[in-house]
Regions:
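Intrinsically disordered, low-complexity regulatory regions
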Residues: 1-106
Length: 106
């Protein structure tokens, strides 16, 4: 009996697990924790979309301002908390822009 190699055609697929859980597991965990803090603090609905309800124009500007405040370590957070907040705010800005692009290209 010969040993056969299994085929899996996934070379062109995005490696979500590898990137999120292998490359950046600690960073992802902290950003998820920061997201939960925000959800608990500003919860309006249980859908985790309260951050998005600001609307694109107000939301992007608000999160850009927050990102810069944390980038310059303005406030009482420790350095690592500021870095986590920078990452979260960058993701929020990117998500606004990607959603706009997705809907504009329909």
């Amino acid at each position: 009996m010969t040993k056969q190699e299994a085929l899996k055609f996934d070379n062109d697929k995005l490696p979500y697990y590898t990137v999120l859980c292998t490359q950046f597991p600690l960073a992802v965990r902290e950003v998820v924790g920061r997201s939960k803090q925000g959800h608990d603090k500003y919860e309006k609905e249980d859908d985790w979309e309260n951050w998005f309800r600001l609307g694109e124009e107000r939301g992007v500007e608000s999160y850009q301002n927050a990102l810069m405040r944390h980038f310059f370590k303005d406030g009482e957070d420790c350095e690592l908390d500021h870095d986590i907040a920078v990452a979260w705010n960058a993701l929020a800005i990117l998500e606004f822009k990607l959603r706009k692009n997705l809907y504009d290209n329909r």
